[in-house]
Amino acid sequence: MTNIHYHKILILDFGSQYTQLIARRVREIGVYCELWAWDVTEQXIREFAPELYQGRAFKSYRGMGSLGAMAKGSSDRYFQSDNAADKLVPEGIEGRIPYKGYLKEIIHQQMGGLRSCMGLTGCATIDELRTKAEFVRISGAGIKESHVHDVAITKEAPNYRMG
């Protein structure tokens, strides 16, 4: 028997007449599903199903040519619709990708970096930064050397990745 908690789906109810039906159908196919009110906090959503690996959050990724996607119906795209599930030849992958956060969080980090850069270059405007900025190529070894040494990072900052 498969673990129904392997995949979790959270549905936020904004008042649609089909929300309950969708949740029921998801449960019927053996996937764990919860239905929450629309005004839930962002933190509660993050805590619902964090897929953590080595302290970082990840999202599932399934390419259309992966075995899982083909078993769910994309096999005809790859001219394998007549093949049994155990005879499918995958042309894609399944895995996980780092979860970087909501767009507003990413933009917040980018804006902080831009402000820092403008301060370091003495620029008051973006137009001035365009003319004063000088891009310098750093080798892979140089990037590695610029990181801290002999420290095991226990929690990465949103704007600093070691790998």
Swiss-Prot record:
Entry-linked SMART domains: IMPDH
UniProt GO molecular function: IMP dehydrogenase activity
Domain of life: Bacteria
Gene Ontology biological process: purine nucleotide biosynthetic process
Secretion signal span: none
InterPro entries: Aldolase_TIM, Class_I_gatase-like, IMP_DH, IMP_DH_GMPRt
Family (UniProt): Belongs to the IMPDH/GMPR family.
Protein name: Putative uncharacterized protein HI_0221.1
Organism: Haemophilus influenzae (strain ATCC 51907 / DSM 11121 / KW20 / Rd)
Upper lineage: Bacteria, Pseudomonadati, Pseudomonadota, Gammaproteobacteria, Pasteurellales
